Amino acid sequence: MTDIVRGFGVLLGPTLVLDLFVVAGTLAVVTGRGFDRRKGAARLLRPLALLGAAFPWAYAFVIRPWHLRWGATGEEVDKPLPGDDLVPEPGIESTRAITVEAPAGKVWPWLAQVGQDRGGFYSYEWLENLAGAQMHNADRVHPEWQHRDVGEIVFLHPAIGPKVAAFEPGTAMVLEGWGVFAVEPIDEHSTRVILRSRTPRRLGVLLYYLLTIEIPHFVMERRMLKGIKERAEKGRNP
């Protein structure tokens, strides 16, 4: 139960901050005249209210489009990837990518071994462990962790995780409910790592994702891409 409570706190924290800005913006509109009558309070509250009013718009039209396609080219955003067929008409789609200055054969092993009970996710380990994930990020490639069977669970937490929908060694791994981890060579010395997630076009699912998952997902996934890049470029192999 403690892990569940901590998990919700970690998950909801960033989104609650956004919600507070929305509330502040609403109050700015509703009580604007009252601020004029209470000049002392106005001096304290008006900057916060203005920020609260502006932030949701900035998030919707600037920040959100940026983070949904962080690091990805227009071509990468538009092209089909393995696993797209699992959610053919998504309500929300994110495509994020990073360039790794290492050959694809040196990058793929880091992706292949992701999982709570394997190499971790190369993200904010301390934050994952606040939610009781018991995560440890590997700093080397483990040969014994280089294969996944379709239907196997990739654990995010000791008790939960998505199933493997497809595993194409050296190319892509698709997880149900998450999306695809893909590796695409640029040339002999550099590689693109692409992560795509698709959320079904169902109102309840979309609301849940927007209100609880979207911001933490970006924060953790961005760090994961950077973590893979750092490890592959250092070439830490057994």
Please describe what each predicted stretch is.
Residues 90-92, 156, 220:
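Short, glycine/acidic-rich beta->alpha junctions
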Residues 52-93:
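Short acidic N-proximal helix/loop "leader" segments that mark the beginning
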Residues 2-11, 30-35, 46, 79-80, ...:
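Glycine-rich portal/gate segments that line the openings of hydrophobic small-molecule binding cavities
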Residues 209, 213-225:
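Short, charged, low-complexity patches
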Residues 70-71, 94, 104, 120:
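Extracytoplasmic entry segments of secretory-pathway proteins
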Residues 2-31, 39-63:
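Hydrophobic alpha-helical topogenic segments used for membrane insertion/localization
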Residues 65-74, 182-193, 221:
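Phosphate-binding glycine-rich loops and adjacent basic patches that engage nucleotide phosphates
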